[in-house]
Structures are given as structure tokens and as C-alpha cells.
Amino acid sequence: MSRLHFVAVLSVINFISVALADEVRLPRSSPESQGVSSKAIREFVETANQKIDTLHSVMVIRHGHVVAEGWWKPESAEKPHILHSLSKSFCSTAVGLAVAEGKLSIDDPVLKFFPEDAPEKPSDKLKQMRVRDLLTMSTGHENEPKFSDEMPWVKSFLAHPVPHKPGTHFQYNSPATYMQSAIVQKVTGQTVLEYLKPRLFDPLGIQSPAWASSPQGVSVGGWGLAVRTEDIAKFGQLYLQKGKWNDKQLVPASWIEQATSRQASTGSDPARDWDQGYGFQFWRCRHEAYRGDGAFGQFCIVLPEQDAVIAITADTKDMQAELNVVWDKLLPAFHAAALPANADEEAKLKAALADLSVPANHTNNTIKLPGSK
């Protein structure tokens, strides 16, 4: 191949790569053209800076268009962010895809997949535990199993006492999500990260996702995934669209419906977003919304009634306060029809979003990305 021909081929590859990157990037639009108030978004940012220590990023989607996006320096658009337990919503999506492919059923007993790791005499309640109970965090445990390097994680989970009848007692349980990941790996021969790549990450244009693994080489599932803010937003938009992306059904709509509906009761306080119920690794919210969330304020909030998605990364200890600012300031920003153009307010919003930074005195709560040192 001549040098000129080689350069030409490289140019074509470059062009195709750029075109593909543009193709999977969400479209941008002015807030008012999508019925969203620029002023209200700006007031959300200003209030968040006053009341929340500290946001890292925010992206607001309306009718499939990004209408506002901002990063608190040193965070940036291309920098992946650790999702903590927001990872769970991605892991449960892998379970849904494996179910759709006939590789398992949510009513399969958990012990079916790990006979070699089962206790010598499993209890009747452990025998009753199903994949469905892992998804809804209703495993029957009184508290979370603890993992260590001294025993394989699956064996540790199965050795943990099950005092309650599975399916009747909600107990937040990250190891239950690890078990979902282990089951997907068992039935597909791939880690959840590998399994989701052609089915979810590649179609959505989620580039180079990273996921922490257990000592046994299983993606940890319930935490440890790192992606960019726009990737979170695209994931939420996929769910808002009932699993359809670019006219292709990536995730069955029936799974989306089950995963985001109330499957387990989590409390009775109408003012608390953690008391609105739990689906398949998604929380129900006030205002008929649902979300995936993770420690220190990671959110993928889906608002079907507003046809909107809000993606937020953060490093705060008061996640309810963070959601309160969303409901108080962002929710009223959405209007039923397009608003008159408002160049002045749009300019003020852009200026505010361009001038964000993490406070110098902020104490960092986040952990390192998978694979980092």
C-alpha cells in the first residue's frame, strides 16, 4: 500500500469514527424549544451550589434532546464517574436481557446455578430464594452478607442466614446484585461487562465502560461501574423509550415495565423518596418518577409524565436534599408545550453552566475508578 493510499484510508477511518461518535451523541437543543425554562434550570444550579456539597455534573434531557449540561471542575464531559449503586440498574438490565434470550427465568431458584457452592444442608428458606428475590432485594436476609477474600463471594452469600421467607422482607442488599452478576456469567459464559457490551453499551455509544471485579473474576454488579454523565443520560432515555433505541428494541418493553414498577414496599413516608417502593434494581420516586441511584448522589432520574431524564453525578452525603432541589427547582421547569425563545435567559444559563467548580474546601468522598491506582 502506498503512503498516499495509507493516509487516505486513515482519513476515511477517521471520518467514519467521528461520524459514528456523532451518531450516538444525544441531540442538543435550546431549553425553551423543548418546553423547558432556562431560568428554572439556572435557579436549580444556583440552589444546588448553595444547598448541596457538591454536584459533579448535571444533564437535563427533554423529548430526547439535551437542553442543559454542566460539569463542576475538575470534572468534565469525557471523564468517567464512578456510579456506586447506580451500577445495579445496569446489572439488572443484563438479567432482563438474559431472561429474554431464554437463559434463565426470574422464578429460577438461586441454588440452581451454584450447587457446588451451596451449604451442605441448605435451609428451606434458602431453597425458596429466587432470582426475582435478588432483583427486588427481598432475599429473606435480616442484614447484608459480608464478603471477604477468605471465601468465594457466592459461597459467602449462600452461607448467610435467611430468617425471613424470601419475597416478603425488603432489605437493601448489594451482595444480592453481585449474585445476579454471577448468575448472568454462569449462564452466558461472559462477565456482565462483556455481555452488555454488544447488547447495550455499543448500541448506546457508551465507550470504554469499566466495572470492578471480585477475586473470582465476576463483575461486582451492585457497584463499581464507571461511565460518563451522557452515558447515564442515554441509559435513562433508553428506559424512558421502553427499551427502544434508533428503532431497535434493545431491551424488552415488558422488562422495562416490571423493572421500574413497585415490586417491594420500602416504607410509608410520602415525603421520602426511599419510601416509594422498589422494582428490579430501580427505586420508585415521588411525582410518578423512578430512578437508579448510587452513594454520594449519583442519579439517573426518569420522569415519564414530563418525557424527561435527569442525570446527576455528585459527591454529597445528603441525597434526599439533592432530590428535593430537583423536585423544587427542575420539576417546575417542564412545560407542556414549547416556550417562546428567551435569548437573555439562555445566555445566563450557559454562563452559569460554564462557571462551575467543586469548592476548594470540599472533602472528597468518592472512590477510585476500576483499574486506577
PLM-predicted stretches and their roles:
Residues 179-183, 223-244, 298-315, 327:
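Active-site-proximal alpha-helical segments within enzyme catalytic domains
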Residues 42, 64, 81-107, 134, ...:
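Active-site SXXK
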Residues 320-373:
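Short, gly/Ser/Thr-rich active-site loops of penicillin-recognizing serine hydrolases
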Residues 7-17:
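Bacterial N-terminal signal peptides
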Residues 82, 101-139, 159, 190-227:
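Active-site helix/loop module of the DD-peptidase/beta-lactamase fold
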Residues 139-213:
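A small/polar active-site loop signature that marks catalytic segments
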Residues 208, 256-310:
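Active-site Gly/Thr loop motif
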Residues 46-76, 307-310:
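A short, well-structured edge-of-sheet supersecondary motif
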